[in-house]
Amino acid sequence: MNGTLDHPDQPDLDAIKMFVGQVPRTWSEKDLRELFEQYGAVYEINILRDRSQNPPQSKGCCFVTFYTRKAALEAQNALHNMKVLPGMHHPIQMKPADSEKNNAVEDRKLFIGMISKKCTENDIRVMFSSFGQIEECRILRGPDGLSRGCAFVTFTTRTMAQTAIKAMHQAQTMEGCSSPMVVKFADTQKDKEQKRMAQQLQQQMQQISAASVWGNLAGLNTLGPQYLALYLQLLQQTASSGNLNTLSSLHPMGGLNAMQLQNLAALAAAASAAQNTPSGTNALTTSSSPLSVLTSSGSSPSSSSSNSVNPIASLGALQTLAGATAGLNVGSLAGMAALNGGLGSSGLSNGTGSTMEALTQAYSGIQQYAAAALPTLYNQNLLTQQSIGAAGSQKEGPEGANLFIYHLPQEFGDQDLLQMFMPFGNVVSAKVFIDKQTNLSKCFGFVSYDNPVSAQAAIQSMNGFQIGMKRLKVQLKRSKNDSKPY
């Protein structure tokens, strides 16, 4: 369909095809044209119809293409979420069609670094014109008007931009430059925001480092709530983008290898999933959730609704990650998620079973479990009191509260076993079985709680937990009435 006489047959090259929703099903193309032409000449309108009906009926949405990009953007600013059409309950939804997103400017825009400061825009165009049609070329200049030695080049397609990167990146060293030319996709707004957040967090960490508290991630306890939320947000964005370099640039994470960073990203993604899960499903209750158990030692029942946030309480447990000097566990991420989203431990634990499985799977990817770190995570007095009677004891709890644990590390003793299972409830006994002839551990033991709920929480969190090259097997001890003890 052609435009009016004062317009060419085709829209401008940078025109945008817009998708428009929340349109009355009774409206015709004429009605829509009258609406849109208030903002500029319309090239084409295409109403989406249900072809299964006879005659085909409108689906209540359409595509519209203006002759100019400016008209499309003006229409979007005036209509999107602003105007409710007759007979509709919600405002118009107007945004670029998916086909336009696939050719977004950010997908075609290149950053060119390490160029000679003598180069002009025309020189850059000549240099890159062989790879395709250039939509825009701009050299970055300082307040004095002099080149900063870098530029932006936007091609009409992403394929052209990719070809230019392959051919030109580090292909030559220009006059006055100390290293080869850099050609890469320009940072998107999301990339810029992520870098800004990382810089803010790095500055805060450096201040803490000056006080020598950054020996490990236990220093997170001294961070204010806003920075804990920032930390989790950075982890979640990194997890979704797959860019682990941002994590490795942070001071306390510099010693982590790629696998450890991936585990961190997996934990962040899982924490994000738990945070976004509707709380009404109640697939796992607060009392049985590993998250609630791991965070319960540091928070009161009312802490999730309190306006004052205690960073230590919200973080919960922290322990070593795969033998590195810094690490996070599910409890700590749950605490940060609580700060970030206004959820307490109970809010996170009311997620679906699949969410908790994702958390457990991500958490079990951590290669080592440092039981020696646990005393610092929980109340030392409580640990001492329980250690007196529980370690080495074979006292049993009520039915359903007694656990059998396989695949313990050879070096684990009664105290280690107690420390590892204390976070899930009151332990009445913890015993590692020893070979009487060799005086070495048989690599299995028993743990008894004073209630079945704690035992189930321990099974959910610790069954399959990896220690070194083995995974723990945690299950209920058989009843006394059974012929076999386990």
From Swiss-Prot:
SMART domains, per database record: RRM (SM00360)
Any GO molecular function: mRNA 5'-UTR binding
Cross-link (Glycyl lysine isopeptide (Lys-Gly) (interchain with G-Cter in SUMO2)), chain numbering: 109
InterPro entries cross-referenced by the UniProt entry: CELF1/2_RRM1, CELF1/2_RRM2, CELF1/2_RRM3, Nucleotide-bd_a/b_plait_sf, RBD_domain_sf, RRM_dom
Chloroplast keyword on record: no
Induction / repression: Its RNA-binding activity on CEBPB mRNA increases in response to EGF.
Tissues and organs where the protein is expressed, per its UniProt entry: Expressed in skeletal muscle, uterus, diaphragm, lung, spleen, testis, mammary gland, adipose, eye and brain (at protein level). Strongly expressed in aging liver (at protein level). Expressed in lung, stomach, heart to very low levels (at protein level). Expressed in germ cells of the seminiferous tubules except in the central region that contains the elongated spermatids and spermatozoa (at protein level). Expressed in Leydig cells of the interstitial tissue (at protein level).
Limits of the RRM domain: 16-99, 108-188, 401-479
One annotated Gene Ontology cellular component of this protein: cytoplasm
Key words of the record: Acetylation, Activator, Cytoplasm, Isopeptide bond, mRNA processing, mRNA splicing, Nucleus, Phosphoprotein, Repeat, RNA-binding, Ubl conjugation
Gene3D superfamilies linked: 3.30.70.330
Biased composition (Low complexity): 284-309
Residues bearing PTM Phosphoserine: 179, 302
Disordered, as annotated region: 277-309
Modifications after synthesis and translation: Phosphorylated. Phosphorylated by CDK4 on Ser-302. Its phosphorylation status increases in aging liver and is important for the formation of the EIF2 complex and activation of CEBPB mRNA translation. Hyperphosphorylated in the EIF2 complex. EGFR signaling regulates its phosphorylation status in epithelial cells.
Residues modified as N-acetylmethionine: 1
Subunit and interaction comment: Associates with polysomes. Interacts with HNRNPH1; the interaction in RNA-dependent. Interacts with PARN. Component of an EIF2 complex at least composed of CELF1/CUGBP1, CALR, CALR3, EIF2S1, EIF2S2, HSP90B1 and HSPA5.
Domain observations: RRM1 and RRM2 domains preferentially target UGU(U/G)-rich mRNA elements.
Protein family membership: Belongs to the CELF/BRUNOL family.
Protein name, per record: CUGBP Elav-like family member 1
GN (gene name): Celf1
